[in-house]
């Protein structure tokens, strides 16, 4: 029996998702509740009166209930809530000290499992536990919180909510409460219950569609490669050849003739294998910048031209020139490696 009571308490912890799965959006919400409660006054202290435990006429009492709740929505299907409830709240008796009335204050921690019918209308169930503030302040109560005689009241709620404009919450639900002792003895009759109407405010939103959207989805303005060109350079040089100017001018004309939209250009500079890695890295970048400067002089925006030096990492002549030893012959053989690869991107495929 004790294990059954422990299982109820650990149910909350088992349902809490990891923080890594929580959305970055603000999921907090706050609200107030009011309704009618059927509760056992013998479980609580009485204001201005003493109750005889043998008086069965007041063993159960129907009275108003008011409260506040604070919750966090991890996603449209799972939330965690804490509530503070006041049972037996009769405003007209607050200042009448001679009148007997019973009032209890309790705190509830619950998980809220929702089933969205639409983005605005949800059905839900809540599983949790309720303890009075007086019981929480008692060391003996805390010591026996997970025993058969526990003051903890496990609770089950069923309800529906409608959210206006993604922020204003309205709810209607009914909560059954029973003692751990009854549950441990396999009693399924709920002894206590609350019928409640709630209103609240969400500080953020969590759309159902966001649950199934991919983080690595393609951008809306995807660009396509529409033109390519290679420009070769002399050995150990960043100077453009006359033939290179002709190629770049033709590339400019082709872009204009195609009436491309949102054009961007990627320049990848390369060097041959002669020299150190650091020197060739700098040389490859400088070659790419030579072309960027010329294209900018033709009217291209510098912000739309990306430059990257590749050094000697991607040779085209690796197999052809592998056995060449004579340096002049090697320089001539490696000519295709001294290049800048140009790729023109556009929204139009």
Swiss-Prot record:
Disulfide bonds join 321-333. Residues 1-22 form the signal peptide. The chain crosses the membrane at residues 27-37, 63-74, 78-86, 105-116, 121-129, 154-163, 168-175, 194-202. Residues 207-218 are annotated as: Hinge-like. The record marks 81, 171 as: Part of salt bridge gating mechanism. Belongs to the outer membrane OOP (TC 1.B.6) superfamily. OmpA family. This is Outer membrane protein A.
């Amino acid at each position: 029996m004790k294990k059954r009571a422990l299982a109820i308490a650990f149910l909350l912890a088992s349902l809490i998702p990891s923080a890594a799965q929580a959305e970055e959006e603000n999921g907090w919400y706050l609200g107030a509740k009011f309704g009618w409660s059927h509760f056992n006054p013998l479980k609580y202290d009485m204001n201005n009166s003493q109750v005889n435990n043998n008086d069965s006429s007041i063993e159960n009492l129907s009275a108003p209930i008011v409260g506040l709740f604070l919750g966090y929505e991890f996603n449209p299907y799972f939330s965690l809530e804490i509530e503070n409830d006041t049972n037996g709240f009769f405003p007209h008796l607050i200042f009448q000290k001679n009148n007997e009335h019973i009032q209890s204050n309790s705190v509830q921690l619950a998980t809220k499992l929702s089933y969205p019918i639409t983005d605005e209308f949800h059905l839900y169930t809540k599983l949790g536990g309720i303890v009075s503030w007086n019981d929480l302040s008692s060391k003996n109560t805390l010591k026996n919180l997970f025993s058969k005689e526990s003051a903890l009241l496990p609770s089950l709620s069923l309800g529906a909510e409608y959210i206006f404009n993604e922020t204003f919450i309205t709810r209607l639900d009914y909560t059954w409460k029973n003692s751990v002792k009854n549950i441990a003895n396999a009693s399924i009759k709920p002894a206590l219950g609350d019928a409640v109407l709630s209103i609240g405010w969400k500080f953020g939103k969590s759309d159902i569609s966001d649950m199934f959207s991919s983080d690595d989805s393609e951008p809306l303005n995807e660009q396509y490669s529409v033109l390519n060109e290679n420009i070769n350079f002399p050995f150990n040089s960043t100077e453009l050849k006359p033939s290179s100017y002709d190629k770049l001018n033709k590339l400019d004309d082709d872009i204009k003739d195609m009436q491309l939209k949102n054009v961007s250009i990627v320049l990848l500079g390369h060097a041959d294998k002669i020299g150190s890695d650091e020197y060739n890295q700098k040389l490859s970048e400088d070659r790419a910048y030579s072309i960027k400067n010329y294209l900018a002089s033709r009217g291209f925006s510098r912000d739309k031209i990306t430059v990257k030096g590749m050094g000697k990492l991607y040779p085209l002549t690796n197999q052809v020139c592998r056995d060449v030893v004579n340096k002049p012959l090697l320089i001539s053989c490696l000519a295709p490696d001294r290049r800048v690869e140009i790729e023109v991107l556009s929204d139009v495929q």
